[in-house]
Amino acid sequence: MTNELPEIGSPARTKAILNRYRLVAKKSLGQNFLSDLNILRNIVAAGDVNDHDNVIEIGPGIGALTEQIAKRAHKVVAFEIDENLLPVLDETLMDYKNVKIINEDILKANLPAVVADEFEADRPLKLVANLPYYITTPILMGVLQSTVRFEAIVVMMQAEVAERLVAEPGTKAYGSLSVIMQYRAHVEIAFNVPRTAFIPQPNVDSAIIRLTPREALPVNPYEDKALFSFVKGCFAHRRKSLWNNLQGIFGKQPEVRERIETVLNQTGISRQLRPERLTLLNFIELTNAFHNEGLM
């Protein structure tokens, strides 16, 4: 390295870059620039990134996290939707030849094609990113449902959303997002990030989530889409009993009610339970049972 400038994620360098390019964080893109080197390094460490790994990043901003990843990874491909940041990244990351920036919306990108074109197939692939908070869930669902196999996913998100992802049955935060995300991956909070670590400061606290995509479950639904739809329907009125929510999904006709009762008896799940008490495996079991009963 010939560049002796402070690292991009230091407060002084971040402010200098923002001032030089007259950059203002765009609320429409959920932009806040992380300017704490310890946190940036800890994010990369949470993904256990090493020189054998290929890494996808989403929303590199001015390159603060990208730099820390590039120092440890074999190669980094980062998706940046904001064209105004491209010349900034060209400058800030000019010394890192193992970084490629793609100016594309990750929600519209052909991720399998990008991975096939940019990375060797025999290297582990990881996702490490400070996600735009307003599209955190669509990004994660898209990534987890794609054919691309990630060894690990480490992302920053709003702390409140993170709590929902890791929530357990019977807790206030437990809901459809908890069930669906935990179906796709083992989820844990690596650590929390205070709002003071950003320029400008957001109005919410943040957390780093680590997801490890699942290999297999003891029981699998006959169809993922059906499971997701069923789970969302069960949580449509979370204060109501499972029985009432099931009638909302399938109908209240006498014949339908009888078939719902049959499934509940078969599975041994009480009609009086609220959906928040059901486990992931309960939801899968019910999805398959209602399918077998001809209701799905």
UniProtKB/Swiss-Prot annotation:
Catalysed conversion reaction: adenosine(1518)/adenosine(1519) in 16S rRNA + 4 S-adenosyl-L-methionine = N(6)-dimethyladenosine(1518)/N(6)-dimethyladenosine(1519) in 16S rRNA + 4 S-adenosyl-L-homocysteine + 4 H(+)
Enzyme Commission designation: 2.1.1.182
Coiled coil: none
CDD domains: AdoMet_MTases
Protein name per its UniProtKB record: Ribosomal RNA small subunit methyltransferase A
Binding positions (S-adenosyl-L-methionine): N32, L34, G59, E80, D105, N130
Assigned GO CC terms: cytosol
One annotated GO molecular function: 16S rRNA (adenine(1518)-N(6)/adenine(1519)-N(6))-dimethyltransferase activity
Function: Specifically dimethylates two adjacent adenosines (A1518 and A1519) in the loop of a conserved hairpin near the 3'-end of 16S rRNA in the 30S particle. May play a critical role in biogenesis of 30S subunits.
Subcellular location: Cytoplasm
InterPro entries noted in UniProt: KsgA/Erm, rRNA_Ade_diMease-like_C, rRNA_Ade_Mease_Trfase_CS, rRNA_Ade_methylase_Trfase_N, rRNA_adenine_dimethylase, SAM-dependent_MTases_sf
NCBIfam families hit by this protein: ksgA
Keyword annotations of the record: Cytoplasm, Methyltransferase, RNA-binding, rRNA processing, S-adenosyl-L-methionine, Transferase
Family the UniProt entry places it in: Belongs to the class I-like SAM-binding methyltransferase superfamily. rRNA adenine N(6)-methyltransferase family. RsmA subfamily.
